[in-house]
Amino acid sequence: MVGFTVAPELIGICRPAVAWLEGARVVERDRRTDAQLTQVEQGLRERPPAEVASVRTMYKRIGLDPTKTRPSSEALLRRVRKGDALPRINSLVDVCNWCSVEFQLPYGLYDAAHVEGAVTLRLGAEGESYPGIRKDEVHVAGRMTLADARGPFGNPTSDSARTMVTAATERAMVVVFAPADTAPDRLSWVLDKTVDRMAGFTGCREINRWLDA
């Protein structure tokens, strides 16, 4: 099992929660998740959740303007509020987006088979970047980023093509990038709910977790 650490510069700024999953059966389109997301979209338009101000504060504390570099959770909520549908990617990613937009916390979801060695949540160094998912290079200098033995591969705004989840994914790592003022009990509940939903729609099971108490 890979290790997980938070670099000193982010302690007191981000309180991540991590779960490792195995045995996932990911499909490109699942009618069950499709129906669930449609229901979620309708509910969010009727009763939109308050944007989590502490998530924006988390970005500001590392020098990022959250109105220009939006947390993934806020980007999803804005999309739904405009009347657009949540993206349909595959059954595991769709559940991840559902949790992110409902709980208004940024998530990262990664194919664990393509994560090499221990993972560290740290600030990106000057010149560091990675090919994004369906986009050009994602530059992470000065940004919160996950890095393994090969370098950066994800952050609370945009993840990498190298570790993206596909229909071939069987093992996954899900990360909740919660602000440091998130109550540990609340964060544990969010992770439990996320794992339960992912298990229900893909058949995966949790094999390990990391929580910053």
Residue ranges and their predicted role:
Residues M1-A213:
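Charge-biased, low-complexity intrinsically disordered regions
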